[in-house]
């Protein structure tokens, strides 16, 4: 192995981690693996080495007596191949790949949000069949609030005169025309005001009226 500084040697990159910023080179002459730091790589761009690539380097002794490779280049001074941003983290298929990440088959966009049976807009999800705002679901749908048989529909609790909850029409302080809140079967209906249809007074129903006949 070339022990003197300034004498170049050849070797193969054993491994290099971009994340850690260092790795090791195996010299061609069979010597011990040499430590190589990111700062010891000659490169105009990102300083990295690819596992298994052939390199040339100088050997330098550090203050602790250990040797390391410096001024590392490709063969005949050419640029190193580098890990191209990969080493240590690999180039795994993340987001967008099959079975992984957002938009991938089986992940994110299929079976997840907006997919069949799940997420927003999917069958059985929010806005879908059986979900909010449609058939059998939340507000505005069949069986939901504001829909057929839901809150405000088919009678329900609350005052049919003013539409407010918490009291009945007979206790309502507001006078008003018929056709109360809600939809099918809602109180109020036609036929004048929201009181007794016998005497026209507010505050009681016809069955409670004390005045004479109709």
Curated annotation (Swiss-Prot):
It holds the Pfam family zf-CCHC. A zinc finger (CCHC-type) spans 157-174, 194-211. Residues 80-91 have a biased composition (Gly residues). CDD domains: CSP_CDS (cd04458). It comes from the Eukaryota. Residues 54-91 are annotated as: Disordered. Keywords: Metal-binding, Repeat, RNA-binding, Zinc, Zinc-finger. SUPFAM superfamilies: Nucleic acid-binding proteins, Retrovirus zinc finger-like domains. Gene3D superfamilies: Nucleic acid-binding proteins (2.40.50.140), Zinc finger, CCHC-type (4.10.60.10). The keyword Oxidoreductase does not apply. Residues 8-75 form the CSD domain. The keyword Cytoplasm does not apply. GO terms for molecular function: RNA binding; zinc ion binding. This is Glycine-rich protein 2.
